[in-house]
Amino acid sequence: MKIIKFKKKEKFKYKRKVIINDLILNIFVGIHNFEKKKKQRVKFNVEILTNPYVFPNNKDLKSIINYEEIVYKIEKLSNLKHHELLEDLSENIFNMLFQNKLVKKVNLKIEKIDIIKKTKSVGIEVSKSKI
C-alpha cells in the first residue's frame, strides 16, 4: 500500500513589493538639441514585486530587495550617459533590476517634469515580469 502525503494548505496568500515613490533626478534625456545641453528633472516611481515566499531575514540582507540600493543604482544608471528616449532608460533599469533573482515583476513610471508647459509631467509607464 502506497501512502500519499498531501501538501499542507497555506493559511495566507502573500504578495510582497518594494516601492520607490517620486524619486527626482536631474539627468540628460531626450532627442531634442536643448535636451542634450541641459539636464532636466525626471521623476521615477518603481514598484517591485518579489517572491512572496522568501521571507525576510534580519541577518541576511540578500533575503530582501534593498530599496536604498535600488535608488542608488537608478541614479548611477541614469547619470551614466545621455538617454535619447525614456523607453531606452526604462529597459536599462529593468535589466538592472531583474539581475536580482528575488524580483518577479516591475512596474516602472518615468516622467519628465518640466518639459511641456500646461502639463504637470509627461512620460511612460511600463510593466515587465518574468515568465
Predicted features along the sequence, with ranges:
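N-terminal, polar/charged subdomain of small-to-medium soluble alpha/beta proteins
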Residues: 1-131
